[in-house]
């Protein structure tokens, strides 16, 4: 009974699933506090560092994983203070080149530098400028590749130059000076460094460079990264620049973009979706009712990617929009609910269940995402996570329709924060135990259940144990995990975790290393606060400007360089 807990709404639950790795995989969401995700990762690390590391890779994986940004980067930075150079180098290289983005290295350096400057006890601990070396080595490799190309075809290079900091950007201001450190590592003068970046970015056709130099005719919308395309669509869709000045260049850009959207609607061209998550598209329509062809095409591409991985048969989704799900988690629940409804075949296609004291089926009408989001917005919502009534609804529907056992719902997705209402006044029977009992009594097999966590709750409770058959627990905002469920051979929390992690390969250097204690720094309250501040400050794109007073100090990433103290920089 020591593991017995309760949800925020009183339902029977557990303090832990019985596996620290599952707890980390399921509990940690974008709303998690630093104390939560560092300590939860530490427990997973102590249980099995190899599985914990694979979960961290999946958490960052922008292609087939959860695609989270700041949490995995913060954990990777934290690990740097505990691992020797060889071990850290082996994992950070894979972290960036296989699963993340070159910008991750900039964030790691920033968090590390600010933490060192504010925390004397770690100022000289495990100094290892591997991030600078990775940038320098890759830039040199790409520069050589471009210069040595004598053929007529364009050679492929990495995106390192896109993210490498320029001299006058945020990441080269004190106390960071990352561009200066990279340039010094490469043995280049400032002018040589600038010319190298210009050449590589021109080769990559980096959007920001094409826009700033008015080379609009070179923009290929079908090849633009999804996030860049979404951010810049308003700029593409007007005849003027940001100052309202009209020009022939901007008119031509607008015309080209309009033609691209027309081709998209006819299926004559493509759109990238890597990096865009379903809720970001649904969010466009929750804040605006204007039709957007780019949003529609990106949604269709995501839906096709899920459908091409397999087919959901007799599947339906329960969408939690209770009060605790306000904001982003609610957007995700709506988006993933619509996606499941569209990707399932059979009688439950296009249908979802909404949480309410008296939940109901809701049929999604409309021919496009805009209309389906409006349909969901008009659905009857309630502020209750009454899962017991959902099971009653599904069962009564089957009894009334005289469904045969094989016609019953096969899998039930619950997009939620897992804080279900109390099922039994005595607290002895959980919602799921109730559902299993009622279905069995009626002669039906209880559906497989996917508990998809979208918010880190205050109670930190979990509804299931690691080996509970017929159930899985997931978390995150990405649709990529839907594909894993389609292809899973076993259906319990532990088996599903291992199935999700199958693609992730660890470096032998890391595998063969001993498990070291990674809790020593965060155990100190002052250190914890300083690390949290460093992480929070790294979220600002242009966080600091120079004040009138400057003092000389040592840059932790470049000890020989004189810089100003962090205290002499203030928030913009």
UniProtKB/Swiss-Prot annotation:
Disulfide bonds: none annotated. It comes from the Viruses. Residues 543-572 are annotated as: Disordered. InterPro entries: DUF7788, UCP015417_vWA, vWFA_dom_sf. Residues 547-563 have a biased composition (Low complexity). This is Uncharacterized protein L728. It comes from Acanthamoeba polyphaga mimivirus.
